[in-house]
Amino acid sequence: MRRKLAFAILNFLIGLLLMYFSIDYGVVSTLVYLGIIVLIYKLFLDIDIRYCLFVIVGCIWMLISILGHYNAENMPFVSKEAICRGYVSTESVDKFGLPVYVCEIDEIIFNGMTYNNYKVRITSKEKQNFSLVGERIEFRAKLDVQEVRDDGIDYRRYLYGKGIDYSSTCRRIKILRDRGFKLSKVRFDIIKAINTKKNLFLSRISPSARGYFSGIIFGEKNLISSDVIEEFQDTGTAHILAVSGLHIGIIYMIFKKLTTRFNLGNRVDFVLILMLGIYIVLASFSISIVRAVLIILLKIIADKLMMRFDFLTAISIAFLISLINNPYSIFDVGLQLSFLSALIIVFIFPHIRRTRHRKLLEIMALPIGLGAYNIVSFGQFSLIAVLANTPVILLISIYVPIGITSFFIYLVSSHYSSILGYLISAIGELTYTVNHSFSLFQKGTLEIEYSDSRLAILLYTFIFIVSSEYFYVKLVSRHDLKQCVGFILIGITIFMF
């Protein structure tokens, strides 16, 4: 059952990509590739060709998304000054130190007409002394569709992957006092309250430790110097400065230990769901956090229904929900890294757990497994990452539980534990020292210019197939050479595409 669901969602993904790239290759080429897939399924892999219906559904869903963005790109107010009103969902700082806000616009007033339901990325030339997250604002600016830059990076697709329709620059932002009852107001009032509590907590931490805590626990790098971030990138440990499924796993582990200790069972799972919802807000709706929360929710549902929880099925459903919500998110680096890491855990970790040095190999598996992706996406591969991740992740596995626990204590009681604060500072400083010592090895990072993603896709496909139970049942046990030919043809098709 789990293999069928995962394969159905894989075909849905193929449909999304076929439709997106049909813009460049043409509809005829897309239909040819679809026909090739049908033939391979039928003649070589003995797979029900009804799975190709999921490919067609994926094509239709991506087409709807493409037409929606095309409509947004041709709205009458594009590249013209308009009055915009909406709520700020997240905030950050660009490389020039200017505040950047993502705003959910519910009113765009242009030529006496009102348009709504768009998401805008705003760069403000006016610096604020306080957070605007959760505030209803008004600004006057030109809403532009992002163009592809000269360096070849498709920033328009990048913003679409984040669910952002337009980018804009404004000189002044006015805060509005929203009156009346609206669901959107209630939602952003909650977001504002959580964000205010987060900022109050950060103000209690010592300045030297504040940047690390904000980066490691909340995924915000604004308080960390660019030199320090570059050091973590050079050692291949920059992932600790971004929130991930590790954080959600730790919250789940702490909660389950407490419920087991006090014999509460599953009766208080709503508290866990509330904590996870709060953390999604704290992490600025990070894709990796949303993915991990979806998996935990599926685990809770499985326990309630007394069903066996399967990690691959949960990943597949979480992936499908992400793609249905925004088909363009397939091009988001955060989503790609998040689900690729999850697949490595599903397919590779069971083999590692049979070895003697399982804990060490599990830490090393992810930086090695993500090597091909890092080469294609970032043009580098860190040799030091294999060594540096072991002590750094060990320290982070201590730091994150202390940090999350101290924050939630403060959230419910406004009590800041000086003991936990001291541990946060000490472990954070030790983590930096250890990472800095590895960064001294300047030759630990290889610069590799290779941007053809087809080879990386083929490599990961081969690794996951060989490490799967399907490989042993179909190919090894039954010596089915026809299946091997089918997989070779799929590889050739990927290269042709």
Regions found by a protein language model. Give the residues of each.
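Divalent metal-coordination and catalytic microenvironments
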Residues: 86, 141, 216, 244, ...
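Alpha-helix C-terminal capping segments
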Residues: 75-78, 198-205, 259-262, 347-355, ...
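Membrane-interface helix/helix-cap signal primarily in integral membrane proteins
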Residues: 61-239
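Membrane-interfacial loop-to-helix junctions in multi-pass transporters
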Residues: 208-209, 225, 265-271, 395
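Hydrophobic alpha-helical transmembrane segments
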Residues: 2-8, 183-191, 211-222, 283-288, ...
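Alpha-helical transmembrane segments of multi-pass integral membrane proteins
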Residues: 345-448
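Hydrophobic alpha-helical transmembrane segments in multi-pass membrane proteins
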Residues: 3, 7, 36, 41-57, ...
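Membrane-embedded alpha-helical segments of integral membrane proteins
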Residues: 1-43, 425-429, 433-471
